[in-house]
Swiss-Prot record:
Top-level taxon in the UniProt lineage: Bacteria
Listed name of the protein: UPF0178 protein GSU0171
Pfam families: DUF188
Entry similarity comment: Belongs to the UPF0178 family.
InterPro entries recorded: UPF0178 (IPR003791)
Organism the protein comes from: Geobacter sulfurreducens (strain ATCC 51573 / DSM 12127 / PCA)
């Protein structure tokens, strides 16, 4: 088992929770980004910097993640790719992507994108990351990792 982080947009608090979980449970962790990331101590932490470009980090994660791995991402299309190949994906706010929910999440993402593109709605994006988001993620991660490690 390995934890993959779509690191470009992952909140720092989520990364810190993941580093602690990786160390505590002795699970390898890989951050993937298209820019250099701060160094993180620990023999189980790896950073991969991919070329700059649309979906390059997502493609790397989708190609390298195994069905026994956990992918942490806010990117719904990447999560859909992981779930389609039998993998496990969790968003940084603690919501598990599933075969049942991924279609609806993709449709909502596409609808909101289209509405923004046509000017029917302004702004967009999620609310600022909060302490309750952090706590929800930590709780979901803990139960998910324990369940995955028991397999």
């Amino acid at each position: 088992m390995k934890i993959w982080i779509d690191a470009d947009a992952c909140p720092r608090a989520v990364k810190e929770i993941l580093f602690r979980a990786s160390t505590r449970l002795r699970v390898p962790l890989c951050l993937v980004a298209n820019r250099s990331l701060a160094k993180h101590a620990g023999p189980l932490v790896e950073s991969v910097v991919v070329a700059d470009g649309f979906d390059v980090a997502d493609d790397y994660i989708a190609e390298h993640a195994a069905p026994t791995d956990l992918v942490v991402t806010a990117d719904v299309p990447l999560a859909a790719r992981i779930v389609a190949k039998g993998g496990v994906a969790l968003d940084p706010r603690g919501e598990l992507y599933s075969e049942e929910s991924i279609g609806e999440r993709l449709a909502m993402r596409d609808l909101l994108s289209e509405l923004r593109d046509t000017g029917m709605i302004q702004g967009g994006g999620p609310a600022p990351f909060s302490m309750s988001d952090r706590n929800r993620f930590a709780s979901a991660l803990d139960s998910l990792l324990h369940r995955m490690l028991r397999r």
